[in-house]
Amino acid sequence: MADLPAPPPPDDAAVPLAQQYARAERLVAQLQAQWSAAGAPPVERIETHISWVLLTATEAYKFKKPVQLGFLDFGSLAARAHACAEELRVNRRLAPGLYLDVVAFHGTADAPAIEGAGPVLEYAVRMRRFAPEAVFDRRLALGQLRVDEVEALARRIARFHAEAEVATPAQPWGQPATVAATVRATLARLADTGADCADLIAWAEQAAQRLAPHHAARLRDGRVREGHGDLHLANLVVLDDGPTAFDAIEFDPGLRWIDVMNDFAFVLMDFMARGRDDLAWRALDAYLEASGDFDGLTGLRYDLVYRASVRAMVARLRDPASAEALSYLACARRCQQIGGPPALVLMRGWSGSGKSTLAQGLLAQIGAVRVRSDVERKRLHGVDALAATRAEVGAGIYTADASARTRARLAEVVRGVLAAGWRLIVDATHLRRDERSEEHTSELQSQFRISYAV
């Protein structure tokens, strides 16, 4: 078995699509029968609108259906071979132990085999099978999903985004017009299903115009990258080496070459839609702590509305009367104002007094973003947020100059987060008078019309 498929076969696009589909469907059915007869337990088959998946005791084989839809074209064997190779590539970035290789099936549709002579009939992505109960949506429904798993997933995605390939301004990805067009098309398709979403369409158009400079800056700053594209809870899983994501979008690069905050917004929105805002805020806190991407908060509400609209559209395409679709539509409307109005909470106390623990509980309770002075201090010096630092005050990263730079960084974050309209908790000692200047706080209150508490 090879990691990548054999050279693409001659293009069979001239073969009628219905004939390709019937042959592939017969091949999958024959494999299921052969493998089930070879031993227990019987091989299961799962079907989606674009795939067949055969589940053996330890592995999964994912076949692309010969279909041509508005958003993908699997209408030839060459196209399906390419899609399998892309699925392997994009998913190995996050789950290398889960995505094993691409296998080619030879023989005939009535007697297919992985090994053998003759032309290739179909390709499949071979994966390691995992328990359904390991997936986030199932774990959440069963009451088994832990906060530490959510936070570990957020940190994993932050690392993934930091390592992902960066889009260039010469590419179409992330351009303000492209971002607006993607959201507009999603809402138009949602409206075509009969959903009442005129208010969402109007809000999104206004937001797109307002955010155009922000989206342009994000592209210039390297925040548009090759992400995952589909980070809802059914695509998140707890494996032996920790939580990660699978089933990234392989068929449309425009859906995964996106702003990293837009990518992560899917996780947050899906928790919110399921009534677990507390987990969404804990996930966002962990992501921001790992990434330092507070600038992404400016467009996050727009991203959340878009992600909720995507899930509402998918649900309505499956069932126009879906209660799930109504839930996502309600979530989209709520996300327009989520995390506001802006407010500022300053934690005060000695190091080790429990401020961070209190702040962590508070942010999940009131729906707020948190910035930690110690984490930002470490970030300025290239130290991991979770790494222990043992330098004395006045030495290492705790010199007077380092402290001044840290205060400047905190001030920058505070202004940016409040300007974006979010509630913010500043987790720092605030023991020095200049760190909690009433004059400065009054200025912030006046400029951003915020509530304020210590």
Q: What is the role of each PLM region?
A:
Residues 350-351:
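The conserved Walker
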Residues 54, 440-454:
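Single conserved hydrophobic/aromatic residue that forms the stacking wall/gate
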Residues 363-422:
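Conserved substrate/cofactor phosphate-moiety recognition/catalytic segment
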Residues 318-338:
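N-terminal pre-Walker A segment at the start of P-loop NTPase domains
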Residues 24-228, 233-306, 310:
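Conserved ATP-binding subdomain of kinase catalytic cores across diverse folds
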Residues 355:
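Conserved lysine of the Walker
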Residues 347:
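Hydrophobic anchor at the beta1->P-loop junction of P-loop NTPases
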Residues 358:
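Hydrophobic positions on the alpha1 helix immediately C-terminal to the Walker A/P-loop
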